[in-house]
């Protein structure tokens, strides 16, 4: 098919309140780091011990996947910003936008960005 000529830059995210993969990448570990999981409004990504964490970290290393955390206080703001554009998303999806914002703070503006909208707002009870 040939639509994509090279492997795209992928940025993974975790909630700042539950970030075992982020902590592992930061420390250069092959296994997820044990973290104290705090309650997060992005409950869909609150996984303290990822079942295939070692495999995920290996994939991140092999494909140079960056991982950033979504600041909890920016998730609600991101959800509101996306709502102003006409999309009703749940908090875990809003974390994608909060993490993208964080990525841009750390690494500069990003162009040609694809952010998935995989959760309708009605899924969340917040």
What role is predicted for each listed range?
Residues 2-7, 11-91:
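Active-site/ligand-binding loops adjacent to catalytic centers
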Residues 5, 33-36, 59, 94-126:
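Phosphate-binding loop/pocket of nucleotide- and phosphate-handling active sites
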């Amino acid at each position: 098919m040939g639509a994509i000529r090279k492997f795209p830059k992928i940025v993974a995210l975790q909630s700042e309140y539950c970030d075992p993969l982020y902590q592992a990448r930061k420390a250069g570990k092959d296994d997820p780091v044990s973290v104290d999981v705090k309650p997060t409004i992005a409950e869909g990504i609150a996984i303290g011990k990822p079942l295939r964490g070692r495999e995920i970290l290996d994939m991140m290393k092999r494909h140079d996947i960056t991982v950033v955390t979504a600041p909890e206080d920016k998730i609600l703001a991101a959800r509101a910003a996306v709502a102003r554009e006409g999309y009703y998303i749940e908090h875990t999806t809003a974390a994608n936008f909060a993490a993208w914002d964080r990525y841009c703070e750390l690494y500069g503006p990003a162009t040609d960005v694809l952010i998935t909208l995989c959760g309708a707002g009605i899924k969340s009870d917040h």
